[in-house]
Every structure is written in C-alpha cells, then in structure tokens.
Amino acid sequence: MSRAFAPYSREEGAIVFVGRKRNPVEPIVSVKDLVKRYGSAVALDHFTLEIAPGEIFGLLGPNGSGKTTAINCILQLLTYDRGEICLFGQPMTQTRYDLKRRIGIVPQNIAVFEELSVQQNIDYFCSLYVSDAAERKQLVKRAIEFVGLEDYTRARPKKLSGGLLRRLNIACGIAHRPELIFLDEPTVAVDPQSRASILDGIKQMNAEGSTIVYTSHYMEEVEEICTRIMIMDKGHTLACGTNEELKALVAAGEKIIIEADVSEAALIKLRSLPHALRVEYESGRLEVVCENAEHNVADVLDALSAARIKPGRIWAEPPTLNDVFLEITGRELRD
C-alpha cells in the first residue's frame, strides 16, 4: 500500500523525504548520520538509510553523487569522519569477518585476475569464504551456470567481451551465496542483451533470498527491479521510497506528447498555461508536462486550436523517476 511522504529535514539545501513507519523488521543494513570528507570536499553529508531483509534497494544518482562512496564506507573499504553502520543488526567494523562472510560485493570496476581462467577466478574468490573444496566445487559450478558462462570456463578474461566480463565479475562476487549483495553499476558499458540478462539474474538472486543493494545512474534499471529507491546527489539524500511513492512527491502529472508543427507563438501560449510545468518542442514532437489536474489535455488542445495548429498523434506518459529528480534538483538525472 502506498504511504504518504512528508518532509523530514533540510540540511544545507538538501531535501530528505521519508515514508511513515514501516513494519518493525530489524534492518539488514542500517546507516545513521554518515559523514565522509576529502579535505574540504564533503562526499557524504549526514547520510542515513535503512534496508529491510528481502529488498532490492536502489541507490540512484548521477556520477559523483556519492553512491559508490556510501557503499565503500558501509563495507569498511573507506574510513569515514562520523556515523554509525550496522549490518545484520550488529556494528560493522573492519575486523567483523563474521559479517563480511555473509556479504557479496560486485564492484563497478572489473576485479578479476587476468592470468586465471573464468573457472579459476570464481573458485579463488569463493575460496575466500568457503574452505571446503567439495562444497566450493558445487558453488562454483552453480555460479557459472547462473551467469551463463558454461562455454567459457577455460577462457582468460582478456578473451571475453564486455558483457561476459561483467557476468564474470558478478559470479566472483556471489558464488558463496551471500545473504546481502552489493552491486555497484553492474551494467556499465554492456550491450542490451547482457544488460537484460544481468537484471534477470538480480531478480532471481532476490527471489532465492538475497537482499540486494543496487547502485546505478540508469533510471530505467532502478525503476524496473527495485522495491525501494533512494535518490542521491552531491552526498545528500534527496528522496527515498517506492517507485510510486517517489512519483507522488512531484507536482508533475502525466507528460502529454503530440505530433504537430508548432510555431514559436504557440509555444509561448502553451508555456503560459496555468498548469504547464515544462514545454519542449523538437522535430515535430511536442512534450508538455503539467501539474496534476483534470483538464490538462483539453487545455493543451485548446491552445493549439487557438493557434490554428492541427495535432497529429496524441498520447500521454506517466511521470518517471527522472521527473522526480528534475523537480527536486532542477536538472536532468544524467547531467
């Protein structure tokens, strides 16, 4: 059920939204008031989040927003200036190897050994968590099948395409069947077929019981697979909630799209409509984003009719996460 959102706090211009209290399940990830500085630059500014067991939790934001820094701090790969981090209900420190064994990490940069084969790479990373050779053999076999690398077990990484390398990177991080998996931009620079395969695999891992933390600047991916989403920018949390909760935050309603030859005078008229938030026109395609209102389409068509413009095909699209980001920050997600 969708829950209403209310402003939580403002910190140096940041806007944080939180939902009303959810089910009292102990979070698998809890971060409170995390601050990370590089000299005078603030990478994370009082960053806070909670992730429940079984979620696919998305961290969405442009490059440089603080997503990777947040993950590295949570995993104790980076020191931080202040804050509290708990995993599985226990304080996380650099020496909590018992907690680290329950975690899988898939970094943004490919982290495999060039001199080892696909199978040897997966076996090596799995051995960091599983000492029993017989058990590890089965886990490695399952990981290879899971990512679809059965035909490449003896291949060296340099012989693999970008998409296959990404699959190997994932297999190395999840072979030991972790309860909590962090995936940092796992689909960067891969072809559409490999991207679809990776997203399907993430859904399957979640269905089998793993909690997923997924960072990306690809809005459509996060929108497709994540049960809850946090939007970040410049080290701040801007908004957090389900897909529908986030869209309910924005004043924008549906986007009206019309194929027509539109004059500059007509565009001026459209931009003056009381509910129009954004009007864009290029190559015969008119897009009008309006506030939620009952008569938006009629008002747009009336304005075109008054300018003696005959519209062609007309359709509407619901608001997207990019609309949420644009309204909160005033810029496109990928600027």
What do these predicted ranges mean?
Residues 83-91, 98-99:
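Conserved ABC transporter NBD signature motif
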Residues 115, 156-163:
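Conserved ABC ATPase signature
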Residues 123, 127, 134-152:
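Conserved ABC ATPase "signature" region
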Residues 170:
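Hydrophobic anchor residue at the start of the ABC signature
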Residues 177:
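Conserved catalytic motifs of ABC-family nucleotide-binding domains
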Residues 181-185:
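Catalytic Walker B motif of ABC-type/P-loop ATPase nucleotide-binding domains
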Residues 199-291:
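ABC transporter nucleotide-binding domain
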